[in-house]
């Protein structure tokens, strides 16, 4: 053969062998990483890619990539949850349109957090949700020298939480919200949250005592505290009934009595979707997974609520004394006096809620 042609052929073969070797080496490293991620021994020989187990593993890996969170803070899946529960929640949230909120979140960070503007006010407009509240705000008879607690029902979750915080922000005073510890994922709002733990453990009790003491100190310093005594989203007692708040926790009453605080009752109108009510009859996993969907389907709509007359501490003492149960019942009645149903009907439905929701 012509020497130049032979040299060219040898060069091509050499380059081809080098490239093949590099690709094989890279594939081996990738396979080892994948096997380590799957909890397998990377020193074992590679499995047959045609095996059912390997095909299932590849499908599962693609599913994980599919539901990878672009906005990992906005999810009701918690790191401590079982793996399957986390995957179900994230998958349902992904299908329900969770990623719709990524761009508004980034704009919120860029245009409001980074520039030191008001934090809560732009949240709902950025996702095209309006609020319509009846009643005077700020309350004309608000005593600026007395501790203030805002108490509200909890029909939606995220939506009424943001709406109540926006009202607190409008007062021009520092504010905090008592919130379930598992929901403190968004770093930009952690400083305005006080985490409550509802698990029946000593650690939870110690945390709640610490939070209560912190809330009392903040109230004395003029910080407004926002609280949803139900601790969870309103649910219907049956698949096709009307939603009612979960039983209110006496934690709120204890805090108000200790701080000698005045209270503003707020009632948010409406309820979550029928699908949410149906899955709530069976367990927490799908119920949690649908909460982002409930916010997504409210886009383009108007959230409505009513602000009740302020309750001075003197009136609280007159109606409840130092009895925490009486006080929480009194506040429940004042908030739900703004509802379209009678208090007796609401209480009856509350008593028929699934047992696991009343704990």
Enumerate the language-model features and the residues they cover:
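Short, flexible loop segments at the rims of nucleotide/cofactor-binding pockets, characterized by
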Residues: 109, 124-130, 154, 201-206, ...
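Non-catalytic C-terminal accessory region of glycerolipid acyltransferases
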Residues: 37-38, 208-359
């Amino acid at each position: 053969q012509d020497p130049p042609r032979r040299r060219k052929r040898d060069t091509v073969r050499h380059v081809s062998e080098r490239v093949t070797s590099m690709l094989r080496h890279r594939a081996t490293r990738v396979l080892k990483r994948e096997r380590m991620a799957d909890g397998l021994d990377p020193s074992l020989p590679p499995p047959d890619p045609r095996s059912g187990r390997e095909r299932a593993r590849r499908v599962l890996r693609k599913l994980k990539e599919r539901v990878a969170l672009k906005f990992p803070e906005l999810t009701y899946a918690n790191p401590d949850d079982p793996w399957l529960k986390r995957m179900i929640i994230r998958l349902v949230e992904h299908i329900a349109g969770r990623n719709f909120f990524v761009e508004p979140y980034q704009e919120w960070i860029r245009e409001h957090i980074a520039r030191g503007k008001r934090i809560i006010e732009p949240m709902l407009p950025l996702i095209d949700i309006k609020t319509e509240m009846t009643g005077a705000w700020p309350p004309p008879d608000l005593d600026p020298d007395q501790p203030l607690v805002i108490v509200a029902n909890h029909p939606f979750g995220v939506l009424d939480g943001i709406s109540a915080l926006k009202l607190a922000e409008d007062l021009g005073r520092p504010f905090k919200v008592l919130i379930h510890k598992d929901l403190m994922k968004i770093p930009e709002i952690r400083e305005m949250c006080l985490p409550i733990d509802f698990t029946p453990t000593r650690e939870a009790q110690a945390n709640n005592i610490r939070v209560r003491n912190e809330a009392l100190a903040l109230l004395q310093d003029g910080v407004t505290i926002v609280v949803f005594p139900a601790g969870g989203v309103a649910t219907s007692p049956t698949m096709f009934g009307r939603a009612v708040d979960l039983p209110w926790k006496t934690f709120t009453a204890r805090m108000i009595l200790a701080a000698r605080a005045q209270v503003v009752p707020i009632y948010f109108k409406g309820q979550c979707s029928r699908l949410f009510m149906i899955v709530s009859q069976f367990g927490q996993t799908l119920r949690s997974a649908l909460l982002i969907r409930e916010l997504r389907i409210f886009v383009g709509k108007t959230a409505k609520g009513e602000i009740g007359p302020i309750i001075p501490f003197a009136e609280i003492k007159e109606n409840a004394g130092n009895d925490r149960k009486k006080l929480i019942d009194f506040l429940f009645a004042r908030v739900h006096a703004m509802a379209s149903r009678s208090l007796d009907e609401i209480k009856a439905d509350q008593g028929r809620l699934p047992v696991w929701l009343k704990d």
